[in-house]
Amino acid sequence: MKIRKLTNEEIKGACAFAVSIYNIAIRGCFRTQESHRYFDEYMDADRLTDEERAGVLVVFGAFDSNVLCGVCGMTNEGHITMLYVHPQYLRRGIGKKLLERVRIYARMQLKLMQVSVNAMPAYTADYFSRVGFKSAYQGGFCNGQGDMYVPMTAKSIYQVEYTPRHIADKTFIAISVGFTCLVFF
C-alpha cells in the first residue's frame, strides 16, 4: 500500500472515485435532496482542481499496485474532507493511514497543531473516535443540510521514522553485567 499526494492532473480521477463511493455506500444515508445537492456541488472536479492548484486543498491517494483504493483531502486550514475508501478495501487500515498522512501534512507543511473533520453521516463519529478524534461540540450532533453530523478535532502529528539499529550481543552482556553489579553491590 502506497499513500502519496495526488498531482493536479489526478484530482479529477479522485473526484470520480469519491463520487462513485458516495453513490454506492453513502447516498442512501442522507435524507434530504439538499445534502445530495451540496455533495454534488462540492465534488465539482474543476473547482477542486482549481483549489489544489491555488494551494487551498491537498488530496492524498492510497494505491494498491497502482490502483486507487482510497482518497482523503484537507484544506489549508486543516479541515479534513473527502475520506473515501473503496468497499473492497475496507477494514485494512487504509482510512487510518490516509488520516495519519494528512495529520502529518498538517503539522509538517501547514504548521497546524490540530485538524478538524465533520463526521457525516453522524454514525461515522465512532470510526473517527477510534482513530484519535474527539467531538468538538458539547451537544454531539449538529444539523447541516437537514442531516446530522459531528464536528470533531484531533491533534496533528509529527512524522516519526524509526530506523532499526543492530546492537551487538556484547553490548547486552555488558549492560547485564553492569546491572547485576549494581544490584548486588
What is each model feature region?
Residues 2-17, 26-27:
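A short beta-loop-alpha structural element at the N-terminal edge
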Residues 19-47:
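Conserved GNAT-fold acetyl-CoA-binding loop/helix
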Residues 56-70:
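Conserved beta-hairpin
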Residues 62, 89, 93-101:
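Conserved acetyl-CoA pyrophosphate-binding loop and the N-cap/start of the following alpha-helix
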Residues 96, 120-138, 142:
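Conserved active-site alpha-helix within GNAT-family acetyltransferase domains
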Residues 43-60, 79:
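A short helix-loop-beta-strand connector motif used in the catalytic cores of GNAT acetyltransferases and
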Residues 106-120:
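Conserved GNAT acetyl-CoA-binding A-motif
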